């Protein structure tokens, strides 16, 4: 055997593309960019995934509905997560082919009592969500998205809020200090350059014209009047609202050759989108039932009723199993899962934190990650050698360009995914995702080739 046959080398995927792949990469990326622009919160993403699913013949499924091979179903979990399935020819007792990704992304949440006036300007108080570099969120245009739930005639009414996504919409901003007066600020540690309590969002400055002698905060009054006219809410209704600010950037091509996509929220919508669309695009009933699980709260620990640690997924699967008179535990122990989450892409601008032999690289394909975690693999699901070999065989057979990845140098830092929560259910699980540059920044970057290979990889996995 030659050295080329004996050595493992991460080669660029461009040398291995078929003509069909070259066309597919560009076409697929266009659909993905549109999805990103619509899906800047998990609520928006669930609505968009459900819309796409229904256009492909999926139906909302409730407990005790009948199931037959080929049925396409979904269930939404509290507006912030969605579970989709294509029922296979084999019994659920023989397991499912499961992909699991998350729809939430780092952002700036509006607090429950947010509105205040100070020195001729109105602001929202915030609490950041997920692991961010706080200084990256100042001096960029922001959108306001979310819902306000108000009580109307004794009933709860949910009102959608979406300001800043249209070209003619106003935007919002967190101000920063001018460099001329930032001498002290620039001496701080990066974690303290902008403090959490300083992430206040500028929302207006024109005082109300309403004659109200009891009101000394006329700008706050003007903002409240506007919110009441537009959404029927009062200040008290912030207590039952979920509002956040996200970057007002649309997804776009990066580079003269348009080989990258730059956008907010690649982590983890760059895995959620191909995990779902590859299920939608199955042309034949698969042997095993294919399940796509898209959850919330991964960025803050996967807790809560919409996170991966909730029982919502177990309940959905138990309902499916009951329809076939199958034990849930039997289904889980015979299932296989791709925990679909991003990994870091090696960045030559920051080589010191990476282990170049093991970290994933842009344009080298879909990345298999045997383990994540930190401090001696703490907080991870370490996939078995047998499972790694099984997924390798699936990808190779389907012509998927793939690579392996890890999360930087040992003891450099670390992170985790939902993999361990699925593995704890006795489901064979391995991480698989798209390498990302500038992860958790307001504007992240991924290679179109890697995105398309994720789509091909998930599809091959469902068909296995």
Residues covered by each model-derived region:
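N-terminal hydrophobic/helix-forming segments and targeting peptides
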Residues: 1-464
